[in-house]
Curated annotation (Swiss-Prot):
The chain crosses the membrane at residues 61-81, 93-113, 243-263, 277-297, 614-634, 662-682, 709-729, 751-771, 785-805, 814-834. InterPro entries: ATPase_P-typ_cation-transptr_N, ATPase_P-typ_cyto_dom_N, ATPase_P-typ_P_site, ATPase_P-typ_TM_dom_sf, ATPase_P-typ_transduc_dom_A_sf, HAD-like_sf, HAD_sf, P-type_ATPase_IIIA. GO terms for biological process: proton export across plasma membrane; proton transmembrane transport; regulation of intracellular pH. Belongs to the cation transport ATPase (P-type) (TC 3.A.3) family. Type IIIA subfamily. Residues 1-60, 114-242, 298-613, 683-708, 772-784, 835-951 are cytoplasmic. The keyword Hydrolase does not apply. This is Plasma membrane ATPase. GO terms for cellular component: plasma membrane.
Length: 951
């Protein structure tokens, strides 16, 4: 193995020496390596992957204490021992220890959960590890690219990411995109003997290659060593920072007001003032926020993977929740991609050829191994698949590529004559055969006939090769026939599209097939037939009715596009994003990569190429549209949990800061910082369970609305703060509870007032999560078992502390079960208005409140709900009449009805629903057949009439 050591040390120039010398130096042959040789070479060269930086577990743990929210808590800890002096008391060690414990608890939970999430993500990403076709033990097989070693023989084809640095063997030239490595914008041609680099993408061709370098020894590996990874600040991080900053600023304002009032105006003692400031710092900071949100995302990501959608980028979850347009491939996503040919409909164009021979030529122009769906269909149509190569010797196979859109086989028959058979897109084959005008007309007529039935067309041609060379152009091509391909829709596609529309997601079909096929498939799936050819995207459509319509508007209103090339997909995504839509795009091929990268959510479908997977945000492990729609629902649940928590966190900050500031300044009552710590620790323990809470997903696409989060948080927090102020006034200045419930008076008893105030703040603070987690009444939407259990346990502990604890250092004394019962009753009574405030804020933020007040003067009406239902019904009727639809049955609505508040779909989805409704009513064997026969009889234009159908 001495020679291999030199290769590992890069002492041999394998990039430039002749290919035969490469085999000598690597001690291998064109038959590849054995498994044993591969294992031995892994010991020498290592696995074919880049070395991951080992992160110190200790530094990672401490990293969770290094963020703006933690800094505020750490500042509070320093204040507790450095500034909290005087008044004849020692430094505040209890608070210092308590703050450190709180920080350690949060960091520990974050560390454990992120570690678990990281392990789960690593296991998921292992499923996405690049695979490659490698020749081992004399057999071709698909293996993980990480096992490759110098000397392995690999196969590289269209859409593959080159798995290692390699030298090309005999075969056709490849087109390689190495822009990611060298910056070259156009694909470069690589001939046999040339070197290809790990990480570049095959754009055209197919060839075998011998591996010469792996892992860190590759061109890509060396470049990666020179570049530090850049930390991109994602949208999620920006939102997190904005919410954290809002809380920090709120606390800072409270502290400044306290300092100004307590010291210069009230002349309060220094030590008491510092403790009041500590209360705001400790209680106001949502220290658990980064932990709760990251854990929620990690758990959600794992749930998505179980449903068949692996998220490569964690923050894609929030974009998936906000997606309102999904551009979906037809083949394989909306349909089964299980093709069949109706032999009775095969059209023969060449003399002396029967339908069976057309099928045989199509099978010859197909692969017998490593097949795609069309190859499998063609070979499968033969009585015996072996007939595809029976009696002939294969010389050269031209694989499919997006430019030529055809495959071809050069072969020698039993008599020694050379022939070529080709199958592919009819337009390409017509051009290849240089057909006459009458033949073209006949071909297009048959294609249209197929398309009206929803059938795709496949053309077959042949030629003789008198020069007997695979590189020669050969004789003239002869157009042989047309085959009809039927790709049945998935059984669940129609229902899934209906669900998507109800969820406010508009599904647009993007297909390379003809317009007529797209329309027929759209009609069958109930997604409407408002489809356009790709030429309409460039404003070149022959349809005069489209000329006046701006391209942006056309794309927005279309149900789909036909005859689409990958560059059109990019344009569709770009235009929709300019119209402020959150766009999802599915793709599977190497040419889809730009559109997948451009889309807000790039979705690589099941069996996508390596290039499509690397460009996407989400990789599907199961076929069909239903996986995507399930993922949308799950993402909205995850997003809802995160949004619920952020509203809760902002509310608690405002409630603590405002409540304790008012009590400290009005009655000069100094609440113990240690008791706020107890509230914070119990709160954080409970709130961690929200990541697994049972939630109702938003009925419409959702996104971070910071104005809604801050407005709701401020209103709910202010209300709770005022409730606490009223409660303290009742126990501090009156005997209200003593008179009404017969409990002992604790008026002006500082330690007992502290216990009572602690319990009241603890109960309502935690109960608030049930309000923020629900869209309707909090007692109607059942929370998760874990959340309820954690709440009850935390409040049991809080109640026991208030009832029994006699802690002089925290200035509390047990108040007994009588007072505990009174405080629970008080908290429950003042809990109910929280829901009403929540509904009111939502109503005000929707803008409808101001419209009603200013435009309709609804403040002075006597109608139920200020006539809201009646006006909405009038609007809906007007809209439906405008589009030729019957008005729905009138339904009653209420201000706080969840379905009423959120039932309006986005305008674009509503339009698609209407078109789908019309399309379904035009099914065959109903009005459609009769109408079309009359139209043809009268010589009218069916397309014009379609636009004027009314129901």
């Amino acid at each position: 193995m001495g020679g291999l050591e030199e290769i590992r040390n890069e002492a041999v120039d394998l990039e430039n020496i002749p290919i035969e010398e490469v085999f000598e130096q690597l001690k291998c042959t064109r038959q590849g390596l054995t498994s044993d040789e591969g294992a031995q070479r892994v010991e020498i060269f290592g696995l074919n992957k880049l070395e991951e930086k080992k992160e110190s577990k200790v530094l990672k743990f401490l990293g969770f204490m290094w963020n703006p929210l933690s800094w505020v808590m750490e500042m509070a800890a320093i204040m507790a021992i450095a500034l909290a002096n005087g008044g004849g008391k020692p430094p505040d060690w209890q608070d210092f220890v308590g703050i450190i414990v709180l920080l350690v608890i949060n960091s520990t939970i974050s560390f454990i959960e992120e570690n678990n999430a990281g392990n789960a993500a690593a296991a998921l990403m292992a499923n996405l590890a690049p695979k490659t076709k490698v020749l081992r033990d004399g057999r071709w097989g698909e293996q993980e690219a990480s096992i490759l070693v110098p000397g392995d023989i690999v196969s590289i084809k269209l859409g593959d990411i080159v798995p290692a640095d390699a030298r090309l063997l005999e075969g056709d030239p490849l087109k390689i995109d190495q822009s990611g490595l060298t910056g070259e914008s156009l694909p470069v041609t690589k001939n046999p003997g040339d070197e290809v680099f790990s990480g570049s993408t095959c754009k055209q061709g197919e060839i075998e290659a011998v591996v010469i370098a792996t892992g860190v020894h590759t061109f890509f590996g060396k470049a990666a060593h020179l570049v530090d990874s850049t930390n991109q600040v994602g949208h999620f991080q920006q939102v997190l920072t904005a919410i954290g900053n809002f809380c920090i600023v709120s606390i800072a304002v409270g502290i400044v007001i306290e300092i100004i009032v307590m010291f210069p105006i009230q002349r309060r003692k220094y030590r008491a003032g510092i403790e009041n400031l500590l209360v705001l710092l400790i209680g106001g900071i949502p220290i658990a926020m980064p932990t709760v949100l990251s854990v929620t995302m990690a758990i959600g990501s794992h749930k998505l993977s179980q449903q068949g959608a692996i998220t490569k980028r964690m923050t894609a979850i929030e974009e998936l929740a906000g997606m309102d347009v999904l551009c979906s491939d037809k083949t394989g996503t909306l349909t089964l991609n299980k093709l069949s040919v109706d032999k009775n409909l095969v059209e023969v164009f060449a003399k002396g050829v029967d339908k069976e021979h057309v099928l045989l030529l199509a099978a010859r122009a197909s692969r017998v191994e490593n097949q795609d769906a069309i190859d499998a269909c063609m070979v499968g149509m033969l009585a015996d698949p072996k007939e595809a190569r029976a009696g002939i010797r294969e010389v050269h196979f031209l694989p499919f590529n997006p430019t030529d859109k055809r495959t071809a086989l050069t072969y020698i028959d039993a008599e020694g004559n050379w022939h070529r058979a080709s199958k592919g897109a009819p337009e390409q084959i017509i051009t290849l055969c240089n057909c006459k005008e009458d033949v073209k007309r006949k071909v297009h007529s048959v294609i249209e006939k197929y398309a009206e039935r929803g059938l795709r067309s496949l053309a077959v041609a042949r030629q003789e090769v008198p020069e007997k060379s695979k590189d020669s152009p050969g004789g003239p091509w002869q157009f042989i026939g047309l085959l009809p391909l039927f790709d049945p829709p998935r059984h669940d596609s129609a229902e899934t599209i209906r669900k998507a529309l109800v969820l406010g997601v508009n599904v647009k079909m993007i297909t390379g097939d003809q317009l007529a096929i797209g329309k027929e498939t759209g009609r069958r799936l109930g997604m409407g037939t408002n489809m356009y050819p790709s030429s309409a995207l460039l404003g070149q459509s022959k349809d005069g009715s489209l000329e006046s319509l701006p391209v942006d508007e056309l794309i927005e209103k279309a149900d789909g596009f036909a005859g689409v090339f990958p560059e059109h997909k990019y344009e569709i995504v770009k235009r929709l994003q300019e119209k402020k839509h959150i766009v999802g795009m599915t793709g599977d091929g190497v040419n889809d990569a730009p559109a997948l990268k451009k889309a807000d959510i790039g979705i690589a479908v099941d069996d996508a190429t390596d290039a499509a997977r690397s460009a996407s945000d989400i990789v599907l492990t199961e076929p069909g549209l239903s996986v995507i729609i399930s993922a949308v629902l799950t993402s909205r649940c995850i997003f809802q949990r995160m949004k619920n928590y952020t509203i809760y966190a902002v509310s608690i900050t405002i409630r603590i800061v405002l409540g304790f500031m008012l009590i400290a300044l009005i009655w000069k009552f100094d609440f113990a910082p240690f008791m706020v710590l107890i509230i914070a620790i119990l709160n954080d323990g409970t709130i961690m369970t929200i990541s697994k809470d049972r939630v109702k997903p938003s009925p419409l696409p959702d996104s971070w609305k910071l104005n809604e989060i801050f407005a709701t948080g401020v209103v709910l927090g202010t209300y709770l703060a005022l409730v606490t102020v009223v409660f303290f006034w009742l126990i501090h200045k009156t005997d209200f509870f003593t008179n009404k419930f017969g409990v002992e008076s604790i008026r002006n008893t500082e330690f007992k007032e502290m216990s009572a105030l602690y319990l009241q703040v603890s109960i309502v603070s935690q109960a608030l999560i049930f309000v923020t987690r629900s869209r309707s009444w909090s007692f109607v939407e059942r929370p998760g078992f874990l959340l309820v259990t954690a709440f009850l346990l935390a409040q049991l502990v809080a109640t026991l502390i208030a009832v029994y604890a006699n802690w002089d250092f925290a200035r509390i004394k047990g108040i007994g079960w009588g007072w505990a019962g009174v405080i629970w009753l008080f908290s429950i009574v003042f809990y109910f208005p929280l829901d009403i405030f929540k509904f009111f804020i939502r109503f005000v933020l929707s803008g409808r409140a101001w419209d009603n007040l200013l435009q309709n003067k609804t403040a002075f009406t006597t109608k139920e709900n200020y006539g809201k239902g009646e006006r909405e019904a009038q609007w809906a009727t007007a809209q439906r009449t405008l589009h030729g639809l019957q008005a729905p049955e009138p339904a009653s609505h209420t201000l706080f009805n969840d379905k009423s508040s959120y039932r309006e779909l986005s305008e674009i989805a509503e339009q698609a629903k209407r078109r789908a409704e019309i399309a379904r009513l035009r099914e065959l064997n109903t009005l459609k057949g009769h109408v079309e026969s009359v139209v043809k009889l009268k010589g009218l234009d069916i397309d014009t009439i379609n636009q004027n159908y009314t129901v």
